[in-house]
């Protein structure tokens, strides 16, 4: 069974220690709820990942664990077969002992767009909300973060993350907890909070922004990346049914509207640092994710529109700073 005890030990003498009052019970309940289904099967695969400590790791320019020179061809083939049991791999890519996990998303492209604009992560405590399998968490560690905590309720993402962590050979200060942000108390403790690709999945975007604010220390930095549309501060797309075949997309604001929401939630120094239309080469079907991807979500006759006729995915990155809260919003 996946254990969170090392995380509890690491935060026992940190500014996250009061989280221990509720966190073990919440994670214990999550484990009980998932003791049937796929999680036990994936945990058995994790228990087979017994490999030597890697001869090289790189989290600065990629997520690379081992060169592959330590493994025989047979060992490498066995490892690849084990890692394929965690398919589909959506966020990456990862390079594990010479095995290239070519994920659906080129998450490294997003990191290259976002990272030049954020405050340096050196010695920062970081929260990544909706972290997926943890690709960006490793890049945050590579950028010098003191501790990185990711939250995502998916059992598969947790097991993909655990596979990379176990193969990395060290107990790195990077932890994925299978939680949604609504399960976090107001911690007021993180120096930087990332929410990338989450806001449009929330039924109440304002509540999500307030939840993000509650995790930041005063003066902490929010890095928010989400779908946007063109328009003024009153422009918000509410898809009638599906958006890009997704039935869980609720609100897609303009950049101006999103900045207004952040201001209303008592963020300051709000600035848009990047906008980018998602390219077909950034999100695509691969050997490690053989299901439908972006090209199937767009109008085959006009890729500037989704298959439903809405504007094709365009993403913006907004950076803001936590200010003294307005009591009317809390």
From Swiss-Prot:
EC number(s) of the enzyme?
A: 2.5.1.-
| GO BP annotation list | tRNA wobble uridine modification
Molecular function terms from GO = methyltransferase activity; transferase activity, transferring alkyl or aryl (other than methyl) groups
Task: Tell me the InterPro entries matching this sequence.
Answer: CmoB, Mo5U34_MeTrfas-like, SAM-dependent_MTases_sf
Q: How does it assemble?
A: Homotetramer.
What keywords is this UniProt entry annotated with?
Answer: Transferase, tRNA processing
Q: Which family does it belong to?
A: Belongs to the class I-like SAM-binding methyltransferase superfamily. CmoB family.
Q: What is this protein called?
A: tRNA U34 carboxymethyltransferase
Biological role: Catalyzes carboxymethyl transfer from carboxy-S-adenosyl-L-methionine (Cx-SAM) to 5-hydroxyuridine (ho5U) to form 5-carboxymethoxyuridine (cmo5U) at position 34 in tRNAs.
Provide the catalytic activity annotation: carboxy-S-adenosyl-L-methionine + 5-hydroxyuridine(34) in tRNA = 5-carboxymethoxyuridine(34) in tRNA + S-adenosyl-L-homocysteine + H(+)
Enumerate the residues binding carboxy-S-adenosyl-L-methionine: 91, 105, 110, 130, 152-154, 181-182, 196, 200, 315
Spell out the PANTHER family in the cross-references.
Answer: METHYLTRANSFERASE (PTHR43464), TRNA U34 CARBOXYMETHYLTRANSFERASE (PTHR43464:SF95)
Primary enzyme class: transferase
Question: Mind telling me which Pfam families this protein's record contains?
Answer: Methyltransf_9
Q: Show the CDD domains listed in the entry.
A: AdoMet_MTases
Which SUPFAM superfamilies does its entry note? S-adenosyl-L-methionine-dependent methyltransferases
């Amino acid at each position: 069974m996946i254990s969170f005890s090392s995380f509890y030990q690491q935060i026992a003498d940190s500014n996250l220690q009061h989280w221990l009052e509720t966190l073990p019970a919440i994670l214990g309940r999550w484990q009980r709820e998932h003791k049937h289904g796929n999680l036990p099967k994936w945990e058995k695969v994790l228990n087979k990942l017994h490999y030597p400590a890697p001869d090289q790791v790189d989290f600065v320019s990629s997520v690379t664990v081992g060169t592959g020179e330590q493994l025989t061809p047979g060992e490498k083939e066995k490892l690849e077969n084990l890692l394929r049991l965690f398919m589909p791999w959506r966020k990456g890519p990862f390079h594990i002992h010479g095995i290239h996990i070519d994920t659906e998303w080129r998450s490294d492209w997003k990191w290259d767009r976002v990272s030049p604009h954020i405050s340096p992560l050196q010695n920062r405590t970081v929260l990544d909300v909706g972290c997926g399998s943890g690709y960006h968490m490793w890049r945050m560690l590579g950028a010098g973060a003191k501790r990185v905590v990711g939250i995502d309720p998916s059992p598969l993402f947790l097991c993909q993350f655990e596979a990379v962590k176990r193969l990395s050979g060290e107990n790195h200060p990077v932890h994925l907890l299978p939680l949604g942000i609504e399960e976090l108390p107001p911690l007021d403790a993180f120096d930087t909070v990332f929410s990338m690709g989450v806001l449009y999945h929330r039924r109440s975007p304002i509540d999500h922004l307030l939840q993000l604010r509650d995790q930041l220390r005063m003066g902490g930095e929010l890095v928010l990346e989400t779908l946007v549309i063109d328009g003024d501060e009153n422009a918000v797309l509410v898809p009638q049914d599906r958006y890009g075949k997704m039935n869980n997309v609720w609100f897609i604001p303009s950049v101006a509207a999103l900045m207004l929401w952040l201001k209303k939630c008592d963020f300051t120094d709000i600035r848009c640092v990047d906008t980018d239309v998602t390219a077909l080469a950034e999100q695509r079907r691969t050997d490690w994710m053989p299901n439908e991807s972006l090209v199937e979500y767009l109008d085959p006759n006009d890729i500037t529109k989704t298959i439903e006729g809405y504007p094709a995915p365009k993403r913006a990155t907004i950076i803001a700073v936590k200010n003294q809260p307005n009591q009317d919003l809390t």
